Design a protein with these regions (language model features):
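Non-catalytic structural scaffold of enzyme domains
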Residues: 1-216
Length: 216
């Protein structure tokens, strides 16, 4: 089994390797490709443009040539899957799609935490659509200043800010908190009140494995 991942941050590779180990994937099961330029372009443009979506789609197509499944690990670029999903023979997934499905499953108030402004719109659409079948109430919260901490290399400060936002969401009555960006996964262990927040790396990889097992 080989799962190819398209990242926009080098630091996310170790996060997904940890998630792979947690769900029992063997060493070498993941192949990583990092395209930081795609997220940088989206941030500069104020969101995902058609041109950036095409570039993302081309990268996904290339990864699919030597993989059993492809996972797009960037929430901002997520909608770009629509460019190629019908042209790729292997499963291609948004890492946050499985997260959204899991988060809304039991209904209640679901708070999805974002750090990047360009992620807010695609995350809102994704979680709102997922909630239609369960009746969950969805709220998207952007954490001011968090992404600047990430980009300057202050990982500890970044995760602390995300954890603080998650705890605030629970204080405000959230049933479950979803950490919408893969880079946030480490913050789940820092949250002291409420259920452990859900994160996308484990959910996304588990969904890919499930799809592959259904096809075999």
């Amino acid at each position: 089994m080989k799962i190819a991942l398209l990242h926009t941050a080098e630091s996310n590779i170790s996060i997904f390797q940890k998630a792979a180990s947690e769900i029992g994937l063997p060493q070498g099961a993941l192949h990583h490709e990092v395209r930081a330029d795609l997220l940088a372009a989206a941030e500069k443009a104020g969101g995902l443009t058609q041109e950036i979506a095409r570039e993302t789609g081309a990268a996904l197509l290339e990864l699919a040539r030597n993989a059993d499944a492809v996972v797009l690990a960037c929430s901002t670029l997520g909608p770009a899957i629509a460019e190629v999903e019908n042209a790729i023979e292997v499963p291609v997934l948004r890492v946050d799609a499985a997260l959204a499905k899991k988060a809304v499953k039991s209904g209640g108030l679901v708070v999805a935490i974002c750090a990047v402004e360009t992620t807010r719109a695609p995350t809102t659409r994704l979680f709102t659509e997922a909630a239609q079948s369960t009746g969950a109430q969805v709220e998207i919260r952007l954490v001011p200043g968090a992404w600047e901490l990430f980009k300057t290399g202050d990982r500890a400060g970044y995760l602390a800010a995300i954890a603080e936002a998650a705890e605030a969401a629970y204080d405000d009555g959230a049933t479950i908190v979803a950490l919408a960006q893969a880079s946030m996964a480490g913050a789940a262990d820092l949250v002291a009140n409420g259920p452990k927040p859900l994160s996308s790396p484990t959910a996304g990889l588990a969904a890919a494995v499930e799809l592959l097992s259904m096809r075999s």
